């Protein structure tokens, strides 16, 4: 699926021409020219009866020959889907673990020269964008591990002077449909300049008075505009200054200062029976008044005031706004585990979330490729687990998955200290945002497992076997062989050993301490629990457990139920991904469960969200085909992103989403092959009166190697997410149980389509208005 960064190590082989020294290692790093070519994404036949594959070539050359760099090497590189068939006799390719592969010289290899030496190979699944090809190689020799690995210069990521975006110059151009479409049945269009010109929608509206997200009700009181250049004077009743300080700071940043001589803004909070924030904002000729039912309502009213502001002349329209959100849960998931995001990025994201009235930050802090939160007493989680570099022993860092290279100071590495995390919590609270931490388990736990194994080895060497064993996450007698969905053979906690739960209890207790220190209660914890393979078949502990537990169903369900009870005892709500929660027995779970519905709408998985909502759980919609912001904006090889759930997620697609009526999208969208599909709701209907709890966008980070790349993928889609999470549009097709939808079913009428298009034009006009924020 992705060809990632290369890391070449000069490696001892059985009969090397020359034994490499550091000079030769350095030379190869500087002079080896590597080119990657995607030959075909849809071969007529795949070797070894593989259902789906793609065909690629690597070529190696040097400008001048160096016989000392001819044979004593291996090339390590990241490719997320396994290479399974290699042609020719120049090189052999071996899958190591996860996405790490190794190239070694084979019998036909006679040395590098100015003429390219090539290897062609087949990889499982598919690859369609240049961002799925990563950079970087390193050099070392196994028989002398004291040599320093060197990144091969030709594979370094470069900055494009025209676009300012990162690019890999070692990739040959992607120019044909055979490099974009994944099979003979794939009709995905090439969304280049010609396509975009033909499908452009010219703006038909000037920037009207309005807000993102759209308020429930907005009435223009006058064509006059109120001048705030002299500042504002907030008069508060029933609310503390701290509760609105960050909204006030945003206004100040935009040029509206807080001063006693400024225009009076009366802010009154009077609680009522309604728990959701509800506010009225009135901008009159001589004053501004805000009435809300809680502090969040007043905060959002001031954010609306900032959104109405013309930043050129500091004037605002005279309006009356009555507003309340569609969903109580309006979230953004940020993955900082695969590739790290700086604290500054998180704080800035919190500011933007608050500006557009999002209120939940799901922080994905641990996965196979990194552990990003310091835990008191378990230093190895971050000293080892927060870094990827080249260390085959994994005692000082994890393997360089996702093409991480060998630099521990690279942007992809790092963690939040206790003080960093406390600062994030407090900053989020000040912006009326709740942080939901997640340390994914029992799958996606390789960083934790390897870090605790490094801890075990260190303490054993110090003669402390009891301490060493306490948090060890490996059962040495377990001989189960498996491959996870990301092709790891060692990334899943053994759910049958006591140490696993000792470790989890320790981690959860320490996370709760951090929340307590911040003055921000840990209300909800997301356990992850997704994509866990059928494992532990040869585990003695699991065989014993299975025999001893009455009504045993499955190991993943057992794990989730046990951790859920642990969280419930600590007074913490349980959240998890729907695929893992599908393994539990509802009767064995706490009553208050949050399920992130991962149902891919067009793959007939909407029933998952319906099923969990029907059993009384709080379902937060997380449909990958519309809410995953690590996917491309358009189906074009230059667009960054993954492609398994959707070939293109434009801001407009997020805007068009009708979250209360999942099957209805069969009328307006197509599947990943650009084909129409049918959604039959008759067997999986929502019960009458059942509603979803919220909507969440997702910024996964496998392909986002820098904060700049993350920003590119997040904006402006974040604003479209906020629009749908806050505002229920008039054009959305109401849900009706049991309907069957298709491109020809006709429920989404021409009138509704016209209303949607007019609403989109309003949204675009506001978004593109340089005079507002």
Swiss-Prot record:
The active site is at 531 (proton donor). Keywords: Disulfide bond, Glycosidase, Hydrolase, Signal. The keyword Signal applies. Its EC number is 3.2.1.52. GO terms for cellular component: membrane. Coiled coil: none annotated. GO terms for molecular function: beta-N-acetylhexosaminidase activity; polysaccharide binding. Disulfide bonds join 46-53, 389-397, 496-542. The keyword Hydrolase applies. GO terms for biological process: carbohydrate metabolic process; glycosaminoglycan metabolic process. It catalyses: Hydrolysis of terminal non-reducing N-acetyl-D-hexosamine residues in N-acetyl-beta-D-hexosaminides. It comes from the Bacteria. Belongs to the glycosyl hydrolase 20 family. This is Beta-hexosaminidase B.
């Amino acid at each position: 699926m992705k060809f990632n960064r290369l890391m070449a190590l000069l490696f001892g082989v059985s009969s090397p021409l020359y034994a490499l020294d550091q000079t030769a290692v350095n030379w190869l790093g500087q002079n080896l020219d590597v080119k990657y070519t995607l030959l075909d994404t849809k071969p007529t036949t795949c070797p070894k009866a593989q259902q789906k594959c793609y065909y690629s070539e690597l070529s190696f050359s040097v400008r001048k020959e160096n016989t000392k760099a001819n044979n004593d090497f291996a090339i390590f590189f990241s490719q997320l889907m396994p290479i399974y068939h290699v042609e020719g006799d120049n090189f052999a390719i071996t899958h190591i673990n996860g996405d790490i592969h190794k190239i070694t010289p084979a019998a036909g290899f006679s040395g590098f020269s100015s003429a390219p030496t090539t290897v062609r190979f087949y990889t499982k699944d598919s690859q369609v964008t240049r961002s799925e090809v990563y950079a970087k190689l390193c050099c070392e020799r196994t028989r002398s591990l004291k040599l320093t690995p060197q990144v091969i210069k030709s594979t370094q990521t470069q900055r494009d002077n025209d676009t300012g975006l990162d690019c890999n110059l070692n990739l040959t151009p992607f120019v044909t449909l055979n490099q974009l479409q994944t099979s003979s049945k794939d009709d995905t269009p090439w969304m280049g300049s010609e396509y975009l010109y033909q499908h452009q929608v010219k703006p038909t509206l000037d920037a009207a008075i309005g807000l993102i997200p759209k308020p429930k009700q907005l009435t223009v009181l006058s064509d006059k505009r109120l001048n705030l250049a002299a500042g504002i004077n907030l008069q508060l009743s029933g609310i503390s200054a701290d509760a609105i300080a960050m909204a006030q700071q945003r206004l100040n940043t935009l040029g509206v200062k807080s001063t006693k001589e400024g225009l009076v803004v009366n802010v009154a909070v009077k609680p009522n029976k309604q728990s959701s924030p509800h506010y009225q904002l009135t901008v009159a000729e001589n004053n501004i008044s805000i009435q809300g039912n809680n502090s969040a309502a007043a905060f959002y009213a001031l954010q609306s005031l900032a959104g109405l502001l013309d930043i050129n002349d500091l004037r605002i329209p005279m309006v009356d706004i009555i507003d309340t959100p569609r969903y109580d849960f309006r979230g953004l998931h940020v993955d900082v585990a695969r590739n790290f995001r700086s604290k500054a990025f998180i704080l800035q994201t919190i500011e933007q979330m608050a500006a557009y009235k999002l209120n939940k930050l799901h922080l994905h802090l641990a996965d196979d490729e990194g552990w990003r939160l310091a835990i008191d007493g378990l230093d190895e989680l971050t000293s080892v687990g927060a870094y990827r570099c080249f260390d085959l022993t994994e005692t000082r860092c994890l393997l360089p998955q996702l093409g991480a290279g060998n630099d521990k100071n690279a942007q992809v590495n790092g963690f939040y200290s206790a003080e960093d995390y406390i600062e994030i919590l407090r900053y989020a609270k000040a912006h009326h945002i709740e942080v939901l931490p997640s340390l994914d388990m029992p799958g996606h736990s390789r960083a934790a497992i390897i870090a605790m194994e490094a801890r075990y080895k260190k303490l054993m060497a110090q003669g402390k076997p009891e301490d060493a064993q306490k948090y060890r996450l490996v059962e040495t007698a377990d001989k189960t062989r498996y491959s996870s969905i990301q092709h790891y053979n060692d990334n899943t906690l053994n759910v049958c050993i006591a140490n696993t739960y000792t470790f989890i209890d320790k981690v959860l207790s320490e996370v709760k301490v951090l929340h307590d220190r911040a003055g921000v209660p840990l209300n909800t914890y997301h356990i992850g629990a997704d994509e866990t393979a059928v494992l532990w078949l040869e585990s003695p502990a699991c065989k014993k457990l299975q025999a001893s537990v009455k009504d045993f169903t499955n190991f993943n369900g057992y794990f989730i139920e046990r951790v859920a009870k642990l969280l419930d005892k600590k007074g913490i709500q349980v959240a998890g991904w729907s695929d893992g929660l599908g393994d539990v027995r509802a009767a064995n779970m706490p009553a208050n469960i949050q399920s992130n519905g991962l149902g891919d709408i067009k793959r007939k998985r909407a029933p998952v969200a319906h099923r969990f909502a029907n059993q009384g759980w709080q379902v937060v919609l997380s449909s990958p085909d519309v809410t995953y912001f690590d996917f491309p904006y358009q189906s074009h090889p230059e667009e960054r992103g993954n492609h398994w759930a959707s070939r293109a997620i434009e801001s407009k697609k997020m805007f068009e989403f009708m979250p209360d009526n999942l099957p209805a999208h069969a009328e307006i969208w197509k599947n990943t092959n650009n084909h129409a599909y049918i959604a039959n709701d008759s067997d999986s209907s929502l019960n009458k009166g059942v509603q979803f709890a919220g909507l969440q966008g997702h910024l996964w980070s496998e392909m986002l190697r820098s904060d700049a790349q993350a920003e590119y993928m997040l904006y402006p889609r974040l604003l479209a997410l906020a629009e749908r999470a806050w505002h229920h549009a008039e054009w959305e097709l109401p849900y009706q149980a049991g309907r069957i939808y298709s491109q020809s079913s006709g429920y989404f009428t021409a009138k509704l389509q016209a209303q949607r298009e007019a609403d989109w034009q309003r949204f675009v006009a506001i978004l593109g208005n340089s005079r507002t924020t």
